[in-house]
Amino acid sequence: MNPTGLYPESLCPIARSLDLLGQKWSLMIVREAVAGATRFADFRAIGIPSDILTKRLTSLVDAGVMERRPYREAGERARDDYHLTPAGMALLPVLSALVEWGTEYLPIPAGRTLENVTTDTHEAVHVAYVNDAGEVINQDRVTIQTVPAA
């Protein structure tokens, strides 16, 4: 049974997104970029092996999630910074939803964790469904269905 009616899987936006973002480390790179990381060494600092980081950054750039910007420090060779594109920044709600889900269903007993907050007041915020009229819709009223592609 295929409740969404999508054949083949390549037509499903979830499957297509996971082809890129489901690779180990990809969303962690985006998380670090949202937090301000731009340089290879910044991303490498979270424990990603260099060869894997190179592949993931290339995939994210090729997909339009990140862009390379050349820079050169005095006396150094030219290198690239990596910055989120608008498509990359549009992943913030995805990361925020994962923060909420992971905090709720995979809690850690102690230490530090992540929380979604506003940039100015650091007030806690939550991911929500909002209709075109701006009304917040309860999750039990939301489903995923097939519609004609745009």
Please report, for each region that a protein language model flagged, where it lies by residue:
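Canonical helix-turn-helix DNA-binding module
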Residues: 44-69
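Extended, folded domain segments that form the structural surfaces/walls around functional sites
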Residues: 38-43, 57, 87, 91-95, ...
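Short, contiguous, well-ordered secondary-structure segments
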Residues: 1-2, 65-72, 90, 94
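Basic, amphipathic "hinge/linker" alpha-helix immediately C-terminal to the N-terminal HTH DNA-binding motif
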Residues: 22, 73-95
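N-terminal helix-turn-helix DNA-binding core of bacterial DNA-binding proteins
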Residues: 12-52
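C-terminal regulatory/oligomerization modules of transcriptional regulators
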Residues: 96, 100-150
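Recognition helices and adjacent regulatory flanks at domain boundaries
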Residues: 1-11, 23-24
